[in-house]
């Protein structure tokens, strides 16, 4: 997913070279509707994030930042060998449209020592979802909903955060995301990338945390996970920590392996979303720890762990009158 969503696949230009641009913000301002006019660029700034070789072009790739903004740069192979985050560069080349946002195709890269990484911009999920922050260095806070190592051959360390307005996947280059405690509150600093459609429209953002940039746990998971009745989930309460895990208990009434589990408690039912493939038996009593969310008709549970308690008699079905 990460490589497929990088904003370059041979970015297009359609007109003769125009004036030279000297800031990243000027290059980004070329994006938008209308014909893209090629400009030469001469930029001075730092490597913000080291990336893998672009799979569609074979060019080296990195995120580059000056005081005005940051941008994706594609460079001829070998030009940035040995360079790292924080190295100060002069980049010469052309501005190109890119597949989502403007990029720079470098013809020359000159190392000039070490520079300062610009501070991250504090953002909300709603701001990220617009696509406007694609490629930018940002800071955002949320609650860890899951953390894992991606399945081979993917080697990414991933965490998924619940943030006001949505959910954000975080990929940390040094692996720390996969060990974040579920239900902890964290502050994450990284570079925004955007999943986008074939027509270049924003679908969903994700964040890449550079090597050496810590993910800060601002609050560990609550020590006690409160037990709630199914019919009181998401009901008014002046206590508790909104957005954190809860526990429920119920009897299994239906199971779709790897997808959903339906529970009932005193004639009140709930759907539990599953990622595991374990089999459950109708009539089995279980305890579920996870996050309550609003479903189409009633609360549901996501990102759960399930504890088997006992085998009981299935609940009696409700008789519907016609």
What role is predicted for each listed range?
Residues 1-11:
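Bacterial N-terminal signal peptides
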Residues 16-322:
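OB-fold single-stranded nucleic acid-binding module
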